[in-house]
């Protein structure tokens, strides 16, 4: 029992660090802008997460590169997946009436902060956190498929509300599939950026 607790403590350690960082930034009252606060928390924890990946031995493995053509394919996949998921979630939300206040707060921030923070910085941090650390630590104790399900579940639940969980779980599986296929975090980072940036652009276009 104690060994299991220690295993899960190690797996979820980076998630707890990010949770603490978010609360520290909020308590500091640096800015009321939700996207700015989220970005600041990401900037705070990213160096620690990179150090943790290095300590885990992730950087000792042979690193694969991502060709430009492949990056474009992955970005288009992300845009398409985001469009499909958004349509389905809008249909679900129109019937179930789930609250999506957190997402609306992020998209209510200034366009520049959204684009740089939510579109670039946060995807990098979340991929290092959820795919680089949580998933790889899960794989040390479980088979690949079970690790993917657990990692996607943790990624989804961490997003907080029912509507985002419905979006984040399949997206988490897709990000992991790209990670496994490409053998580099650059794959899911590009996909995640494409998803977030396309969401920002679609939302901005819809508000015109």
Role assignments for model-derived ranges:
Residues 58-122, 140:
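Juxtamembrane helix-loop-helix connectors linking adjacent transmembrane helices
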Residues 1-71, 76, 80-84, 90, ...:
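N-terminal, membrane-interfacial amphipathic/helix-forming hydrophobic leader that caps
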Residues 17, 128-150, 177-184:
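Membrane-interface helix/loop boundary segments of multi-pass membrane proteins
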Residues 30-41, 109-114, 143-151, 184-187:
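Membrane-interface starts of transmembrane alpha-helices
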Residues 39-45, 116, 166-174:
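Membrane-embedded alpha-helical segments of multi-pass membrane proteins
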Residues 19-27, 152, 157, 163-208:
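Functionally important transmembrane alpha-helices
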Residues 8-12, 71-76, 112-116, 145-150, ...:
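Hydrophobic alpha-helical transmembrane segments
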Residues 124-129, 133-134, 161, 194, ...:
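Active-site His/Glu-centered metal-binding helix of metallohydrolases
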